[in-house]
């Protein structure tokens, strides 16, 4: 990342994985109570921010299928501007790397990186807690990325407690299909009564490391997604025959964990033609963590 008084370049918006994802209830407003552990990855979209003197917020690059006015990045910048009353403006460039509809948190991470970067570029000095209170207005996953640490998540995903996770390498395989999150959450077959667990339960099992990630919990959405999307089912079956694996979020991406990059790359090299695989190392902290206190 490069930093100047007029711009912030090469700001990473890291992907996340759900190491497990349990749906424990449904609220009257339609939101779901969940439990999960969010893992940051050193892989994601890259954003660039340049000050404007006319006060406008503008997206300087096109994102196919995402109109500028509905882009979470633009919404995040405008929300921050309205909250603080700053007269500053910004041009935002987005180098998309993460596939959309993949369960990797791409749009949410872009929004969080925008909040953190503009907190620095616009010299706002908002606290992390204040940024998180804005982030929840943009989506359930956005507060996690502002939180900036690997976390045990509860509520709708906004109740976060830091967890220390071992350094690992991940292979993330994404079939060529977009899975709408709302469609999966509304499916009548989705399990919504999984028994709550504790952070101690997860840490005890994780530390044993036997067969991780599938040694603890499950992804309650995986069965619904694989029943509706054959492409995801094919990836799950193929990868699980090689190593323990699991779908992240509402899909479509499926991941496996390895102790070394070499092991992950070896499996990636054997992926069927046409499948998109990425190898990434775990992160313990968001690259822009220091941009809020």
Curated annotation (Swiss-Prot):
* Pathway in which this enzyme or protein is active: Isoprenoid biosynthesis; isopentenyl diphosphate biosynthesis via DXP pathway; isopentenyl diphosphate from 1-deoxy-D-xylulose 5-phosphate: step 3/6
> Broadest EC class?
transferase
Give GO MF terms, alphabetically.
Answer: 4-(cytidine 5'-diphospho)-2-C-methyl-D-erythritol kinase activity; ATP binding
Tell me its EC number(s), please: 2.7.1.148
What Gene3D superfamilies does the database record attribute to this sequence? 3.30.230.10, GHMP kinase, C-terminal domain
In this chain, ATP is annotated as bound at 99-109
Q: Which domain of life is it from?
A: Bacteria
BP-aspect Gene Ontology terms = isopentenyl diphosphate biosynthetic process, methylerythritol 4-phosphate pathway; terpenoid biosynthetic process
- Keyword ATP-binding tagged: yes
Q: Which InterPro entries does this one have? A: GHMP_kinase_C_dom, GHMP_kinase_C_sf, GHMP_kinase_N_dom, IspE, Ribosomal_Su5_D2-typ_SF, Ribsml_uS5_D2-typ_fold_subgr
Q: Which keywords does the record carry? A: ATP-binding, Isoprene biosynthesis, Kinase, Nucleotide-binding, Transferase
Catalytic residues (positions): 16, 141
Q: Which reaction does it catalyse?
A: 4-CDP-2-C-methyl-D-erythritol + ATP = 4-CDP-2-C-methyl-D-erythritol 2-phosphate + ADP + H(+)
Which family is this sequence assigned to?
A: Belongs to the GHMP kinase family. IspE subfamily.
State the protein's purpose: Catalyzes the phosphorylation of the position 2 hydroxy group of 4-diphosphocytidyl-2C-methyl-D-erythritol.
- What is the recorded name of this protein? 4-diphosphocytidyl-2-C-methyl-D-erythritol kinase
Q: Which organism is it from?
A: Burkholderia vietnamiensis (strain G4 / LMG 22486)
Taxonomy, top ranks, is: Bacteria, Pseudomonadati, Pseudomonadota, Betaproteobacteria, Burkholderiales
